[in-house]
Design a protein with these regions (language model features):
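A late C-terminal transmembrane helix in Major Facilitator Superfamily
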Residues: 316-345
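Helix-loop boundary and gating motifs at the non-cytosolic
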Residues: 2-51, 197-203, 211-225, 232
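Helix-to-loop junctions at the C-terminal end of transmembrane segments
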Residues: 57-69, 246-258, 344
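Intracellular juxtamembrane helix-capping segments at the cytosolic ends
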Residues: 109-122, 299-313
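C-terminal membrane-cytosol helix-exit motif in multi-pass small-molecule transporters
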Residues: 162-182, 365-370
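C-terminal transmembrane helical hairpin of 12-TM major facilitator-type secondary transporters
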Residues: 260-303
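Structural signature of the two symmetry-related core transmembrane helices
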Residues: 72-86, 261-276, 356
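Cytoplasmic helix-loop-helix junction between adjacent transmembrane helices
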Residues: 101-136
Length: 377
């Protein structure tokens, strides 16, 4: 294995373990607050502090990527997360707002720097496969993390999460090849990066909005369609499995064929697929198949976008675009559940209609951008 591939493998492995840490800690904190008797609005406000941390650190990420090596940024952030998680059992519950804010800051550093680092070290011919593996590994960690709550009672999950962060840091520190700071580019303001990559911003907001709405409301929608709570939860799990597994073949295709045409195809299939939800949910096997493929095709929009961004930008500018994308992710995640709730209140099939509408609008936007960049061809 070449030094370059070893570095990529180490980063992807460390990111999957970080995904476990995040997937464990997010529901853990909410459950502990619920157990202590706090209302949903308080729990939601605490969860929003993670997004506030993301918004706060994003403008500084391009400069950080210039000043420090990616390995140093990631390992120090992982050590910070270790300390923060171990502090939760000893800090008064109101102090958890500050801890959650700092978790958002250091988690954002890890995600932006790893995406930038992988793009910086991969060759163009394998860029999509590498980033598809990254997306799948991170998603796998997110999915498995909550399951660890079933085997660890009390305060143990906080220490378990800290231990996973430590493991990830040690793997990265001892195994990753040395790398210099990512670039010497002149850093631009964060808003400039929004205008430099408008399609990437739209794709990120779309993915975050529907992911947040789906995770919160898909089970409710399926139950309204006559599914039991267990069966509806299994349907959500099938969607998540598809979102993980299908990224690898999408990455393979994206390294061989026109990535923008694949993006348009995924957006079109996501639009049509969402419109089929009401029909498919009447036949369980069709619903499982549809959700499996829809989850994979929809998440592929994000995989293809981060690949396109990596092909177009380098160094601090790449980190800047990813930082701007993370802000759009936060915006999408904040408004997605609200839009979903309003849509479901207005229409029986409001959730799939909303998904189809947003995917359709993104398809039209991507088509317009493609024609503009190709001189109307």
């Amino acid at each position: 294995m070449t030094t370059q591939r070893l570095g990529q493998a180490v980063v992807i492995g460390a990111v999957m373990i970080f995904g476990l840490t995040y997937g464990l800690s997010a529901p853990l904190i909410s459950l502990r607050l619920h157990t202590e008797g706090y209302d949903e609005w308080f729990i939601g406000l605490n969860a929003a502090m993670h997004a506030v941390g993301v918004f706060a650190v994003a403008p500084f990420l391009p400069a950080l990527c210039q000043r420090y090596t990616p390995g140093a940024l990631i390992t120090r952030s992982l050590f910070a997360i270790l300390v923060l998680l171990c502090l939760f059992p000893f800090v008064p519950l109101l102090g958890w707002f500050a801890l959650r804010f700092l978790l958002g800051v250091f988690s954002e550093i890890i995600l932006v720097v790893t995406e930038t680092w992988l793009n910086h070290t991969t060759v163009e011919q394998a860029r999509a496969k590498t980033l598809a593996l990254y997306t799948a590994s991170l998603s796998l960690g997110y999915a498995i993390g909550p399951l660890l709550l079933l085997i660890a009672p009390g305060d143990i999950p906080f220490y378990l999460g800290g231990g996973l962060a430590l493991l990830s840091a040690v793997i990265l520190w001892t195994s990753a090849p040395p790398s210099p700071p990512l670039a010497e580019d002149k850093v631009s303001g964060i808003l400039r990066y929004v205008w430099m990559a408008p399609l990437a911003m739209a794709a990120t907001a779309l993915n975050a909005a529907l992911e947040a709405a789906g995770l919160n409301l898909l089970v409710v929608y399926a139950m309204q369609m006559g599914w039991s709570e267990q069966a509806a939860t299994e349907l959500l799990a099938v969607l998540m499995v598809g979102a993980i597994v299908l990224q690898l073949p999408v990455g393979w295709l994206a390294d061989k064929y026109d990535r923008h045409k694949l993006l348009l195809g995924c957006a079109a299939l996501s639009t049509v697929g969402a419109l089929l939800w009401p029909l498919a949910l009447n036949v369980p096997i069709l619903a499982w198949l549809l959700m499996f493929f829809w989850g994979g095709v929809f998440v592929a929009i994000y995989t293809l976008i981060i690949t396109q961004v990596g092909s177009r930008f380098t160094g601090a500018h790449l980190a800047g675009v990813y930082a701007a994308m993370s802000i759009m992710w936060g915006v999408g995640a904040l408004i997605g559940p609200s839009l979903g709730g309003i849509a479901m209140s207005a229409f029986t099939h409001g959730l799939p209609y909303l998904a189809a509408l947003l995917c359709g609008l993104f398809f039209l936007w991507a088509l317009w951008v493609h024609k503009r960049e190709n001189g109307g061809a």
